[in-house]
Structure formats: C-alpha cells, structure tokens
C-alpha cells in the first residue's frame, strides 16, 4: 500500500500569508482535503495521512517527524505564495535528492499546470525544512500569490480550488503509479458526450462563468477527463481543452 503524506501549510496560531481577505492556512487546508478526497475517490492502492485536517498548529519538525515515522512514500506540502508575484511554482530540496524526487515533481508540476491557468513560474529548488528533513521524496507547491489581486480572485473560487486539487491528485497518482478505480475513467474505453439540447455553452475553464462557445444538438465531443464536481454541478473536460456540463438533461455520455 503506497503511503501519501499531505501537508497543508501553516494552521492554528500560524495563519501564513494574509491578504485580500484570505488566509493561507485556510486555503492550504481546503486544497489538501480536496486532494485527499479526489485520490480516495478515483484511485486505489494507497493510504493517506495528513499533518492536519483542521485548523491546528503543527511545527515544521512535527510534520516531517510524523511523515518519517509513518514511513511515507511521498511528502507533498501545499502552500500559497506571497510577495507580489503571480503564478504557480513548486520546489524540491536544493541539496542531493533521489531520482524519484525529481521525477515525481516533474509529473506533479505537469498535472497542476494542465488544470490551472496560473502563470507557470517553473520548477525550483530550495532549502526548506520540509524538503530537507523528510526522508522520502518531497515537494512543496506554491499555488498563486495571495497578495496579487488576480491570483487572489481565483483562490476565492471554490471551483478553482477544485482544479488545483485535481492537479495535485492526478500528479501524485501519476508519480506513484496509482491505479484508477473502475468507473472513474480507467476502463480503457474512450468516453464521448453528445449534445441533446438545441444549444449549449462550453467553457474555457472549469468555471461556470467562463463561457467559451455555443455547441449544437447532435454534436459529439471526445472526453479527456471524466466528470468532476464544479460548484453545485459537474463538468467533463473535452479533448479540445474546453469544458462542458455533465448534466444528463443536456448531454448523453457513452463509451466505445
């Protein structure tokens, strides 16, 4: 059983970065819990432990000691950036690391960038405690800048946090070679959606407000990602990169 350790940054008496009506500790916990839930919903062959599942205080040493004693296979620390920049970046230790550390990070970075429209700030290295003191491959992600209005507005959207979490979950699964559960896109058959209403909006991103183009009844599209929750509804991502509702009132899903 593969052991995944999720570490929502900060918490309790340590709010982390604070700006634009947001607290880093709240956002990191939301993303980590969503990541856990997606992994448990879509993948098998793993177990997950978290440094915290509520607003509690944990020192850096407590986090790495817990992961080390548990024997985690991968340590993923989730953070929100600050300092006036914009975009997503992630870090591995700037000292000697295993090949898996690099490979795992590359896969995670790629999957997150598939999901978000943050500026890609690249793959970096640093001497952070959680990267240095963890005895397994470890990565620290920085998901947008809390003190930059454009990034903060995205972080205020629960649907956008879903996308960040989906990127983390899929990246972790790719890195560790987790198997998809049957019924969650792993059947080997290609999925399609057919529009069954006279006209229907598609979306540029997984956001009901980000409308793209109208498609018409009878049009069929290749599904790139099985349905996932967005706000109060569900969407599919299409091979074209656009998104479409998964409501059976408007589309028919089938495989072949």
Q: Which residues does each PLM region occupy?
A:
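Active-site/binding-pocket entry motifs
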Residues: 12, 114, 146-147, 201, ...
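Hydrophobic alpha-helical context, especially transmembrane and signal-peptide helices
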Residues: 12, 19, 113, 156, ...
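Beta-loop motif signature
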Residues: 185-235, 243-256
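Short, well-ordered turn and helix-capping elements at secondary-structure junctions
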Residues: 10, 52, 94-96, 127, ...
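Short, solvent-exposed loop/turn elements at domain surfaces
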Residues: 14-16, 100, 201-204
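Active-site-proximal helix/loop segments of hydrolytic enzymes
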Residues: 2-4, 22, 26-184
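Short glycine-rich His-centered loop
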Residues: 2-21
């Amino acid at each position: 059983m593969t052991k995944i350790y999720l570490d929502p940054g900060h918490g309790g008496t340590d709010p982390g970065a604070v700006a634009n009506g947001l607290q880093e500790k709240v956002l990191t916990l939301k993303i980590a819990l969503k990541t856990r839930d997606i992994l448990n919903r879509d993948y098998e062959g793993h177990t997950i432990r978290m440094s915290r599942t509520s607003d509690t205080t944990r020192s850096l040493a407590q986090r790495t000691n817990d992961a080390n004693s548990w024997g985690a296979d991968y340590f993923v620390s989730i953070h929100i950036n600050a300092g006036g920049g914009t975009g997503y970046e992630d870090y591995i230790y700037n000292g000697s690391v295993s090949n898996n550390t690099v490979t795992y990070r590359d896969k995670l970075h790629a999957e997150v960038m598939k999901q978000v429209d943050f500026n890609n700030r690249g793959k970096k290295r640093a001497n952070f405690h959680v990267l240095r003191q963890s005895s397994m491959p470890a990565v620290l992600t920085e998901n947008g800048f809390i003190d930059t209005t454009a990034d903060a507005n995205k972080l205020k959207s629960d649907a956008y946090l879903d996308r960040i979490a989906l990127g983390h979950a899929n990246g972790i699964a790719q890195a560790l070679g987790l198997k998809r559960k049957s019924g969650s896109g792993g059947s080997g058959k290609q999925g399609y959606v057919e529009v069954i209403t006279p006209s229907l909006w598609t979306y540029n991103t997984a956001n009901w407000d980000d409308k793209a183009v109208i498609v018409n009844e009878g049009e069929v599209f290749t599904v790139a990602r099985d349905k996932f929750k967005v706000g109060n509804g569900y969407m599919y991502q299409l091979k074209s990169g656009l998104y479409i509702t998964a409501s059976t009132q408007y589309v028919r899903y089938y495989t072949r």
